[in-house]
């Protein structure tokens, strides 16, 4: 019973912290979703996914098979960023059933929006710089999906959502302090 209580303490805390972020995001932008990344405790993925969803958020990706998300370190295999952009039409053509997202800073995000990626995960861009960037990227491609990532937490989720992004990628709920719960045992 103690192990179950510990799991319940932790998962309830994750759901509660997630709910706080979802409420803050939706208050600022009802169309902005909170998305938790795959950087969770090993062996607890299924439980944490359930807790996140109970809190009102969604898993960013449950696995590599869901969405193609290209990070900076992947660009090496394409010959660098510029070579990746040149190959983008062919890459998108091979990802017939998948959306192609790329994590980028502000400068590269502009290039990627022009190149026609399905989505951009804008990494570590401060809120005050993100809002004008979102407007600029939407002017380039009104259909591009924009996700803010890097440092998104319950205290700033509303501010990030207010920039007009479609989603907030975060690991913050996974660091929730377990709730203080107890169990009472009674004879049958």
Feature locations, PLM:
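Helix N-cap/beta->alpha junction signal
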Residues: 105-106, 153
